[in-house]
From Swiss-Prot:
This is Protein PA-X. Transmembrane segments: none annotated. Belongs to the influenza viruses PA-X family. It is found in: Host cytoplasm; Host nucleus. Gene3D superfamilies: Influenza RNA-dependent RNA polymerase subunit PA, endonuclease domain. The record marks 195, 198-199 as: Important for efficient shutoff activity and nuclear localization. One of its GO terms (biological process) is viral translational frameshifting. It comes from Influenza A virus (strain A/Equine/London/1416/1973 H7N7). GO terms for molecular function: RNA binding.
Length: 252
């Protein structure tokens, strides 16, 4: 799973996921399913935000990479991916500026068009079950919830899906591709099932030589589809800006 994650996701996303796990004392090399889940969630948050801007009239517009008007204000502020101290600093700044109600839990995004915080969910289960879990945890009507699944389903607060259909389809397609690639490498079942995940973890530990004396065959084949999985959705200029913004505060 770790090899898959490093080949499948943008290096910046992998780096942010590693830092997030280490912040909580977790090891990406051991808890590989969580590593994959965090990378997937980060990517969906970035895709949710990318190419969405607010023009001088306060209207939401979609501008593709390379457009000369790309200096317009981004519609979404990305909170997910920052260390907790910086994330809360951003949230407090937004609340002071917009007078939005401060959330009890760190949200993933802030939508400047709708003036609300957004919680993004990516689930391997039924969307309505995960939605209810999120809503029960947050307990706030002020935070908008949007759930995506690997099967193409989605659910959002008051059926308000925020983004246009094409932008949401892009996210759903990416999630479906990740699922298909995991399945082709025999990783999907362990990603979905906790019991299967434990079995896969034991297998991974053996392959790393931590269970010496137990024979195991490890496949090093790389799926051809992985060669075209490098995400092309992210504005290269914004990628650099996001990297600098997210990582500079973590340097010691």
């Amino acid at each position: 799973m770790e090899d898959f994650v490093r080949q499948c996701f943008n290096p910046m996303i992998v780096e942010l996921a590693e830092k997030a796990m280490k912040e909580y004392g977790e090891d990406p090399k051991i808890e590989t399913n969580k590593f994959a889940a965090i990378c997937t969630h980060l990517e969906v948050c970035f895709m949710y935000s990318d190419f969405h801007f607010i023009n001088e009239l306060g209207e939401s517009v979609i501008i593709e990479s390379g457009d000369p008007n790309a200096l317009l204000k981004h519609r979404f502020e990305i909170i997910e991916g920052r260390d907790r101290t910086m994330a809360w600093t951003v949230v407090n700044s937004i609340c002071n500026t917009t007078r939005a109600e401060k959330p009890k839990f760190l949200p993933d995004l802030y939508d400047y068009k709708e003036n609300r915080f957004v919680e993004i969910g990516v689930t391997r289960r039924e969307v309505h079950i995960y939605y209810l879990e999120k809503a029960n945890k947050i307990k706030s009507e002020k935070t908008h919830i949007h759930i995506f699944s690997f099967t193409g389903e989605e659910m959002a607060t008051k059926a308000d899906y925020t983004l246009d259909e094409e932008s949401r389809a892009r996210i759903k397609t990416r999630l479906f591709t990740i699922r298909q690639e995991m399945a082709s490498r025999g990783l999907w079942d362990s990603f979905v099932s906790p019991r299967e995940a434990k079995r896969q973890l034991k297998k991974d530990l053996k392959s790393q030589g931590q269970c010496a004396g137990l024979p195991i065959t490890v496949s090093h084949r790389t799926s051809p589809a992985l060669k075209i999985l490098e995400p092309m959705w992210m504005d290269s200029n914004r990628t650099a800006a996001l990297r600098a913004s997210f990582l500079k505060c973590q340097k010691k």
